[in-house]
Design a protein with these regions (language model features):
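Membrane-embedded, hydrophobic transmembrane alpha-helices
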Residues: 1-97
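Hydrophobic, aromatic-rich transmembrane alpha-helices
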Residues: 20, 24, 180-196, 371-411
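Membrane-interface alpha helices of multi-pass inner-membrane proteins
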Residues: 64-68, 262-289, 328, 424-428
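Perimembrane helix-loop-helix junctions
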Residues: 86-96, 283-313
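Active-site lumenal/periplasmic loops and adjacent helix-entry segments of GT-C-fold
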Residues: 113-205, 210, 226-229
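Membrane-lumen/periplasm interface segments of specific transmembrane helices
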Residues: 116-119, 160, 306-383
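Signature aromatic-anchored transmembrane alpha helix within multi-pass, membrane-resident enzymes
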Residues: 259-270, 288-289, 308-313, 418, ...
Length: 542
């Protein structure tokens, strides 16, 4: 079947699968942790149902990476994840809340238009697709990063994406990103229309305005709001998850109200962010602060608190072990976290990758001239454009907040925000102030303007809906609308790369992209793959 109706049907079928998979996982972990988190639970006034699809993605990714310890993901066992859907029969649906989720589904019709002008990201051909191919063709490979350095920063997204190769058009990978866009707009919409927790209202309204401002400004726009990327990148999911999770954590702290079901969901989302990308570790600043206030308010020890999420801690340990086996480092490519006496570890190789990674992101070395670094950073046109538009957006939204909203000052909240933003900015300054990584923090900065602000007069829901619809329409690029067709179904095709022989294997004849070829690597180093044991071991040749 190859028509537009089936295309939309395929997306909604995928959405429903993730929805009920996420629900299954929460039912299971509720039993394991003895924390009640049923279909009637609310997270800061938000129905738990809006988080089901994202939790489903988290569950699918963790099932797949654990399975990959034993077998390649082309193995039929990868599809056993479908069996977990049976768990749904053990708990009745909250029909009212499910109905509210269905109301939000039309959001995706607009967002799906982005599929008509989508293609592979440069990094997809560089390492993502070949990494996924290795995951599909082999169980966990010791020293995988020796084949090609970027394989070492493998995200949980690689495992999810490799599973989605079942769709030969690669659209399911794009659909996964779209689900995160839907989460963001559902989060904003619910906060502005039916959430009784008014602390989330003003910040959400400012985020909505900010999303519209993204389409105007220097060089036509872009101010740090989410941008639908080409297939193969996971920066958008990280930005959305970071924003939503940090807002929820801060809201719990500021309200001084702590519930076990919220603690459990926050823990899931925080772990997911870290698994998506190592730079997501910044969420730990918010999470640790939340844990401190939670244990203080409930008067329990940190060990008793963490015992409630033993299963998630075990998942974390297996994830770090995976990194250690594939790279020799707990946190790749941080050379100081590597175990150098492992047979597949080469210290010089790791140090070189660490330096390349930090320098590629225009990182700042403390002690060097900040003035020179800023000048160099702003020489990149994208950095200059986004930063300028972001500052203008912030100033405009600040003025709007002063005119149309009342500010109830709270010194404690301001101190917490100052400390946590300072720590986050210093981290990104040192380890990668790339605009792609900063999007979540930039959106949180916009939201923070609205903290402790309440409308002077009620904002008509009709106006909110008009603004939301306008913002949604602007999410797909203009070229996507131009490419939209009722007769052509979106698909992307793998390009063919010319190869040369290097060290007895294949390498790109020009450039550095292998696309999908397990015998290809752009690595100039020579390596050896030992296939004699149950696990393949890759070592660099001297």
């Amino acid at each position: 079947m190859d028509n537009i109706i089936f295309f939309f049907f395929k997306f909604y079928l995928y959405y429903i699968f993730l929805y009920f998979l996420g629900r299954s996982f929460l039912i299971l972990i509720s039993k394991l942790s003895k924390i009640k988190i049923d279909s009637f639970a609310k997270i800061q006034g938000l129905e738990i149902q809006i988080f089901y699809p994202v939790v489903g993605i988290f569950f699918l990714g963790n099932y797949l990476y654990l399975l990959n310890y034993l077998v390649p993901l082309s193995h039929p066992a990868a599809y056993f994840s479908l069996l977990f859907l049976i768990v749904n029969i053990y708990e009745p649906l909250n029909r009212a809340a499910t109905k509210n989720v269905i109301i939000n589904l039309p959001f995706y019709v607009i967002i799906l238009i982005s599929s008509f002008d989508i293609n592979f990201h440069y990094d997809a051909g560089l390492y993502h697709l070949n990494n996924q191919l290795w995951i599909r063709e082999s169980n966990i490979v010791f020293g995988l990063s020796n084949i090609y350095g970027p394989f070492g920063v493998g995200s949980i997204y690689e495992y999810i994406s490799s599973f989605l190769w079942v769709d030969k058009t690669f659209m399911l990978i794009h659909f996964t990103n779209i689900i995160f866009v839907g989460l963001l707009f559902s989060f904003i919409f619910i906060n502005l229309t039916r959430n009784k927790n008014q602390q989330l209202y003003t910040g959400s309204f400012l985020l909505l305005l900010y999303s519209i401002f993204d389409n105007f400004g220097l060089t036509g726009g872009r101010n740090g709001f989410i941008n639908i990327q080409s297939i193969g990148k996971q920066d958008l999911p990280i930005a959305v998850l970071f924003l939503v999770t940090s807002i929820l954590l801060l809201t719990s702290i500021f309200r001084n109200r702590y519930k076990e079901e919220e603690f459990l969901l926050y823990s899931i989302l925080a772990l997911f962010i870290f698994q998506l990308k190592i730079s997501g570790v910044v969420i730990s600043f918010f999470y640790i602060l939340f844990l401190y206030y939670y244990k203080t308010e409930k008067n329990i020890t940190i060990f008793k608190l963490l015992s409630k999420i033993k299963f998630l801690i075990i998942l974390s340990l297996f994830w770090l072990t995976k990194s250690l086996l594939q790279t020799g480092c707990v946190i790749f490519p941080l050379e100081s976290s590597c175990i150098t006496n492992l047979s597949w570890v080469n210290s010089d190789y790791l140090l070189n990758i660490e330096n390349v990674t930090v320098n590629f992101s225009n990182s700042y070395y403390f002690g060097e001239s900040l003035k020179i670094w800023i000048e160099t950073y702003l020489e990149v046109p994208t950095n200059q454009t986004i930063l300028f538009n972001y500052i203008i957006s912030l100033l405009t939204l600040y003025i709007i907040s002063k005119i149309f909203f009342i500010n109830y000052k709270n010194i404690k909240k301001h101190k917490i925000l100052f400390i946590i933003f300072s720590a986050s900015c210093l981290f990104y300054l040192r380890f990668g102030p790339d605009m792609r990584y900063l999007s979540g923090l930039m959106m949180l900065g916009v939201y923070s303007i609205g903290i402790n602000h309440y409308p002077r007069k009620n904002i008509p829901i009709f106006l909110v809906k008009i603004l939301l619809l306008s913002s949604l329409i602007m999410v797909p690029k203009l070229d996507s609308y131009k490419s939209f067709s009722l007769s052509n179904v979106p698909r992307v095709l793998l390009p063919e790369e010319k190869m040369i022989e290097r060290h007895g294997r294949l390498a790109p004849s020009s450039g550095d992209r292998c696309w999908v070829n397990i015998n290809c690597s752009a690595n100039f180093e020579n390596y050896n793959i030992d296939n004699s044991g149950y696990f393949k071991i890759v070592t660099l040749k001297k």
